[in-house]
């Protein structure tokens, strides 16, 4: 075995090794940055080189309608439209960021309690006030004589509702059903804890069992965007209405929703998914009490700081609707969704290789005009013999989507997010219009 020269000690060798490795790392990073790869990855896309832009780099949608076909892109990039990350709202909030800025002093939010006189004792009074106000302004939900339950996103509220509505006796787990295509996370959340209170019961369209059941009604529906009502229609059914997308940028507001349990979330109403705040409007006091009990057991309440931020954001949204000199938040959001759906429908018409749903126009009481739904997701169907649309788009187009199988539907369907940043969405349009014909 060779001897290390005396003038090189083990300490010298260690320093030399570290220097060599560090230089290699710098070279790799430099190469990544020169290729334009984003360094700040989120966990769910860490295995793919995803196109990412900062909000300041996003182009306006008005110019996108003219320029997406001229985009210069790296064909090796992966476009991830699998998740509903609402970064389409970044531009609006950057331009209006000052009015939502708030300072939270260090002594604030020390106590667990927000309002000991409220049934939901961890609900911040300011948030409760702004929730009632925004629903009154938009006209999308009845809030009078309702209990407001705040949660860490609507996902926690869904679990709380299952806990509250399930029988707590020896009758066994109650079935939970939803009509296909249903929200892909419902089965996973329902069965993740193997609860003795409830279990996933499958497609509401084919459900025939006797006895009590819980039916989830998502309207507008995720993934296909259609307005929905209950399907089973048995007298023993208990309904949960997920209304996360019942806002005027996505669908006409035809009347205030009036149901026993209604779930909403900041992530899809204002785009603030990272704050993780949702709320339920609950008609029955005992149901609300049990939902609150679940959240007590699960997380001992909900972040006060997040609640205060959402309260501030909702106030700005409501204030903007009364601003006669400028566009409201919902005007901006509607325009963005309208432009994207116009481009996608035109692409489908031009290529004839894929299709998206046709919607019925209705009059929106909020905007005072008639328009078609323009959902947060596109239920995208590959035509002409493509059996597995998700696989085709992933392997041939380098576009990540969510397969229809996760929604209880066919492999020829995929769900595509319409909420990503402009650059990603424009490259997506460019690929499906410029190279669809050459691949098929």
UniProtKB/Swiss-Prot annotation:
Any one biological process term the GO annotation gives: gynoecium development
Native organism: Arabidopsis thaliana (Mouse-ear cress)
Residues the record lists as binding pyridoxal 5'-phosphate: 112, 154-155, 222, 242-245, 265-268, 276
Gene disruption: observed consequences: No visible phenotype.
Catalytic activity: L-tryptophan + 2-oxoglutarate = indole-3-pyruvate + L-glutamate; L-tryptophan + pyruvate = indole-3-pyruvate + L-alanine
Gene that this sequence comes from: TAR2
Name of the protein in its database record: Tryptophan aminotransferase-related protein 2
Cell compartments where the protein resides: Membrane
Keywords, in A-Z order: Aminotransferase, Auxin biosynthesis, Membrane, Pyridoxal phosphate, Transferase, Transmembrane, Transmembrane helix
Cofactor requirements of the protein: pyridoxal 5'-phosphate
Taxonomy of the source species: Eukaryota, Viridiplantae, Streptophyta, Embryophyta, Tracheophyta
